[in-house]
Amino acid sequence: MSTPAVTAIVLNYNGHGFVTESVRSLLDQEFRDIEVVVVDNASADGSAEEIEAAFGSRVRLVRAPRNLGFGAGNNLGIRGARGRHIVLLNNDAVAAPEFVGELVKAAEADITIGMVAAKVLQYSERDVIDTTGHLLYPDGLNRGRGRLERDEGQYDRCATALFPSGAAALYTRRMLDDIGLFEESFFLYGDDTELGLRGRLSGWGCALAPRAVAYHHYSRSVGAYSTQKAFYVERNRVLVLFRTFPVSLIVVSPAFTALRLALQAWGALTGRGASGRLAAETSLFHLIGLTIRAYGSALAALPHVLGERWRQRVRRRIGTREFLGLMAEHRLRARDAAFKA
């Protein structure tokens, strides 16, 4: 059996009604040297059986014994992958026919490229951007570049991104062999941030392939403004901070966090941004309690994260000045973090 150029992985959890569209979009790619793998995270809605019935042997179905989360679930697929490039596509995203080919073209343009970001548009409004790579706030929080802007080609001339969204991305085998796979303790959210920053710290570049288009139902699996999402986003941004940021930035990060939380609290009170949407579903006091619980959970995970930071130190190929330069180029502003949905 010949080795494919690309292994495309769809991680599925209870994707009944939409995962088959995602898988079919990969099988219908113009780029044909591809194997498609679906990792099912112990779905309880029959979607794994739906995939089996719809695609048979055209798709390799890997069943996880339980819901492993994003990082561990994708790692299960990556460990069994045969391709020299790994493409990830969320089960609530659909790839345009040129998607994989454009990602591969960008990855193979330069041997230093370890990641490629796609242009991800909203599924329901296909001229509205979901992400063109990520922006980073100085306390570890991230947000999609261009999110909710009308797509007028404003990012098409950007050759690079800081790191890709795991909803639609390519990672080269050579980078993953160098730095390792996703951090499995995150479970949800921030996994792609940690891996992307670890790659950048190790000297790998990230290209943007604006013609690699995917259409995404934003946070369909857990809800765009759910308390579960808010918990993991806040918990895991702390872990990203301690795993990847320079010590000098960790020291000053509480000031940036205080500013962001103050603006988010104002957003919750005035109904603006994601905090306002969350506050409409629950109380401000509940959100404060959720944030405290997130910090407690992050504190419990810190020994593991700091141990991984120590083990990864020998692979760091850029210093604090270069990291700050990347942050300046791809910085998320506090007002945007607080007031944009």
Residue ranges of each PLM-predicted region?
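Conserved short acidic donor-positioning loop in nucleotide-sugar-dependent glycosyltransferases
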Residues: 14, 26, 41-46, 54, ...
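Short, acidic, metal-binding catalytic loop of nucleotide-sugar glycosyltransferases
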Residues: 24-33
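Glycine-rich, basic loop-to-helix element that forms the pyrophosphate-binding segment
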Residues: 64-81, 91, 102
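Short aromatic/hydrophobic "clamp" motif used to bind/position activated sugar donors
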Residues: 86
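Conserved donor NDP-sugar-binding/catalytic core segment of glycosyltransferases
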Residues: 94-137, 141
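A recurrent flexible, glycine/aromatic-enriched loop bordering the glycosyltransferase active site
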Residues: 128-129, 138-143, 149-174, 193-194, ...
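A short, conserved alpha-helix in the catalytic core of glycosyltransferases
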Residues: 162-213
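Active-site-adjacent helix/loop segment of glycosyltransferases
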Residues: 202, 206-307, 321-324, 329
